[in-house]
Amino acid sequence: MSFNHKTIEELHDLLVAKEISATELTQATLEDIKSREEAVGSFITVSEEVALKQAAAIDAKGIDADNLMSGIPLAVKDNISTKEILTTAASKMLYNYEPIFNATSVANAYAKDMIVIGKTNMDEFAMGGSTETSYFKKTKNAWDHTKVPGGSSGGSATAVASGQVRLSLGSDTGGSIRQPAAFNSVVGLKPTYGTVSRYGLIAFGSSLDQIGPFAPTVKENAQLLNVIASSDVKDATSAPVRIADYTSKIGRDIKGMKIALPKEYLGEGIDPEIKETVLASVKQFEALGATVEEVSLPHSKYGVAVYYIIASSEASSNLQRFDGIRYGFRADDAKNLDEIYVNTRSQGFGDEVKRRIMLGTFSLSSGYYDAYFKKAGQVRTLIIQDFDKVFADYDLILGPTTPTVAFGLDTLNHDPVAMYLADLLTIPVNLAGLPGISIPAGFVDGLPVGLQLIGPKYAEETIYQAAAAFEAVTDYHKQQPIIFGGDK
């Protein structure tokens, strides 16, 4: 029996009433994963033994009626550390790495008696926009198995969209939660930088990375954020601002809310059908009582260039720790220390990771630092100032999540620049450290379109309020791919 059509609140009621046990729910979820995995390839590791052990322990002490997440399964992106469960970052470099600690986000989930059911596929070290750079497999879009799921958190998105699991965690450095959420018609939130601890997240771009939730609905997404968001002394970038309940504004109307629509988000590079879908969404928000006005974010056009200098520079530094000495892959043909370093990194990293390490090393090198890294930092400040000006007069910003719908497998993975431009609309949010959500907003030729809502820092409650209001008057979130029902 499958429970994948039940909301978290409905599952909680069943667990509290003892109509099902945590073990039965876990077993049903494992079956949902196994029956769909060959078709979509969402998971690198399914932690069946660990999950059933956790479920048995929860059943033994009883479901906590006051704890919504007690006994609820959770899928976790494979760059988030999980004790006793392999954490590979989808790389040959970490193919056998089993952490001795949990990431704070995972520890928070365990503290609420959630059950980690497995680790999801991703682009290697979160570098990619299609989940095709994974060392292990290519994940497929839940709606069309010939299309990419987006990236880098592709497995976390398809696991939810295909009905394998109700909730999952991803990470977002330049759009890695929101883009796959859009491509698979689920809800994905990138929180304000510092809202969720980065402790235990395998670092890519330290000034950009943020862990966030995937769910089928806005409310369930907020409920999962309630679990994982916390201040953390182990993370120096943990934000001091704390929200008591991210669901608190869900259900309120949005009459009088002022929403900005940047003209740059509907300009060059945006598919006409995506633009039409967004403009239809604007009418929905206006019908709900919000005011939507056109604005300008003039420096957003530089976002992709700025991002790939800063993110690659940070990655080139962060990935120096992977050298074959302490853990992970080590080349067996090395005859001395230099060869251990060179051969291990040459063989252990994939092409995209090596490309970004080289780009970042170049940007930080003597003679080029001022021209590239320093200049990128200055333009990043201009992008932040653009957002600040808009948010002085508006509550939220609205636009498409992606410039196109999901593209075909093996179509852009040999064209890095085209792949990078797929993050055109999500990258500025990371550069500014802002919260952004992607929600289902329609379909083009049978493929999902995502609508992005962006807020000022710590405005997740307002984002959820507006997203839930839109969700309540549309049915896109209720439409499911064929695989959700069990058919391939």
UniProtKB/Swiss-Prot annotation:
It holds the Pfam family Amidase. It comes from the Bacteria. The keyword Nucleotide-binding applies. Its EC number is 6.3.5.7. InterPro entries: Amidase, Amidase_CS, Amidase_dom, AS_sf, GatA. Belongs to the amidase family. GatA subfamily. This is Glutamyl-tRNA(Gln) amidotransferase subunit A. It comes from Streptococcus pyogenes serotype M1.
